[in-house]
């Protein structure tokens, strides 16, 4: 059985956070959810986080600053930034994926998470092939 991946979810909107947490947990992920970026950053420092999903606009530290702080600690951690603002994505952000709230289906978020986790893990290692003795190649 493969170990469950842990996703750090951050959103100051408790309803959105609760929905996202339930959606991810029912798909087999462990979820650490926080309404404050500062608390989420402290949890991240404890380790065992595989991916970050955060809202963009929050009181205190906003989503892009949270992602930057996390990537200062662990540069290869995948991060998804979600915004309710339908504005142009801030290309200075270190997020790997940007999703406009209300403009994506839950299945889109789940697929992005899956792809980012696969990319983080890297390609499956191929087992070296055992050379076949001459004369057996193509023999049935």
Task: Tell what function each PLM region has.
Residues 1-6, 107-140:
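Non-catalytic signal-transmission and effector/linker regions of two-component phosphorelay proteins
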Residues 14-32:
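Two-component/phosphorelay signaling modules centered on CheY-like receiver
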Residues 33-51:
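Acidic, metal-coordinating helix/loop segments flanking the phosphotransfer/catalytic sites
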Residues 35-36, 62-65:
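Acidic catalytic/metal-coordinating carboxylates
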Residues 42, 64-76:
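Short amphipathic alpha-helix used as the core "switch/output" element in two-component signaling
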Residues 55:
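Active-site residues of response regulator receiver
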Residues 58:
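Receiver (REC) domain active-site loop signature in two-component systems and cognate sites
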